[in-house]
Swiss-Prot record:
Function noted in UniProt: Capsid protein self-assembles to form an icosahedral capsid with a T=3 symmetry, about 32-35 nm in diameter, and consisting of 180 capsid proteins. Also acts as a suppressor of RNA-mediated gene silencing, also known as post-transcriptional gene silencing (PTGS), a mechanism of plant viral defense that limits the accumulation of viral RNAs.
Species for this entry: Carnation mottle virus (isolate China/Shanghai) (CarMV)
Requisite cofactors: Ca(2+)
Protein name as annotated: Capsid protein
Keyword Calcium: yes
């Protein structure tokens, strides 16, 4: 480094500047290279036309291999193999019951059950298995604070058990809550993290395919069949094991039904009633075998509307319906009790 400093000090340009009184050149010539600061040394190099060697550096890039993230049993699904749905859906409209004897309504918790999961049930037709990671039933009141009556929610993790028909049976359920009609209440249902097969038919073992059974009980109201609130189901469900799409339309006659349960048929003499299990938009096609085999279908219920196109000669009826709540009906009167009818129901 001293040889470098001496060479720069002896440079003709530096010597000339020193003779002219340049402070940097004078300092370098009289006091030496070591007396200069870093910036002064750089300036002296520039004055002498000295170009330092260019050093090339190749940055080191460490190679890292990230292992696949470890997932837990309760983690969300993986793209291409499963799908996670987190949603809140309308379960039912709650109606009051008079007197001290309670009324009961129940639902089996299964992803393809349209009555419980109106929207999820359509997606579930593409999968074989499911796992519930969070489940809550919410009661939302729609009555005044002066309304009398009680609303109770219960859950049984064994869907094969007979639903309760008494207060004693209801309060024997493993999980239940109760509230005044004008007060909101949540039933948080414990989940077990198990992966279950999705129910394909009524003959499947409920202990293996169904998550459990929800129960609603009402009593003590001043008026019967008055709307007091709504039930919502909030869930996170992982659908897995993709499969071919199951049937998405329901076909039935007076006795046998195939496909998802959108409507529940019941026969009373010459009358066929189709009870819609959930709110939504539906296309219902009714066909007979002889001319004038049935009359024009009629809509029954405060929450149903739509158009009915009817031809008696064929005979056929095409009904485009909107239901605002579950339990609305389509009534068909046959000209003969033995007259068979075919019904096909589509979700719109």
């Amino acid at each position: 480094m001293e040889n470098k400093g001496e060479k720069i000090a002896m440079n003709p340009t530096v010597q000339t500047l020193a003779q002219k009184g340049d402070k940097l050149a004078v300092k370098l010539v009289t006091r030496g290279w070591a007396s200069l600061s870093t910036n002064q040394k750089r300036r002296a190099e520039m004055l002498a036309g000295y170009t330092p060697a260019i050093l090339a550096f190749t940055p080191r890039r460490p190679r890292m291999t990230n292992s696949p993230p470890r997932t837990s049993r309760n983690s969300p699904g993986q793209a291409g193999k499963s799908m996670t749905m987190s949603k809140t859906e309308l379960l039912c409209t709650v109606k009051g019951t008079t007197g001290v004897i309670p009324s009961f309504e129940d639902w089996v918790v299964s992803p393809r059950n349209v009555a419980v999961f109106p929207q999820l049930s359509l997606l579930a037709t593409n999968f074989n298995k499911y796992r519930i990671t969070a489940l809550t039933v919410k009661y939302s009141p729609a009555c005044s604070f002066e309304t009398n009556g009680r609303v109770a929610l219960g859950f049984n993790d064994d869907a094969s058990d007979t639903p309760p028909t008494t207060k004693v049976g209801f309060y024997d359920l493993g999980k239940h809550v109760e509230t005044a009609a004008q007060t909101a209440k949540d039933l948080v249902i414990p989940v077990d993290g198990k992966t279950r097969f999705i129910r394909d038919s009524a003959s499947d073992d409920a202990k293996l395919v169904d998550f459990g059974r929800l129960v609603l009980s009402t009593y003590g109201f001043d008026k019967a069949d008055t709307v007091v609130g709504e039930l919502f189901i909030q869930y996170t469900i992982v659908l897995s094991d993709p499969t071919k799409t199951a049937k998405i339309s329901q076909a039935s006659n007076d006795k046998v039904s195939d496909g998802p349960t959108y409507v529940v048929p019941s026969v009373n003499g010459n009358e066929l009633q189709l009870r819609v299990v959930a709110a939504g938009k539906w296309c219902i096609i009714v066909r007979g075998t002889v001319e004038g085999g049935f009359t024009k279908p009629t809509l029954i219920g405060p929450g149903i509307s739509g158009d009915v196109d009817y031809e008696s000669a064929r005979p056929i009826a095409i009904c485009e319906l909107v239901t605002q709540m579950e339990g609305q009906m389509l009534k068909i009167t046959k000209t003969s009790a033995e007259q068979p009818l075919k019904v096909v129901v589509y979700r719109m």
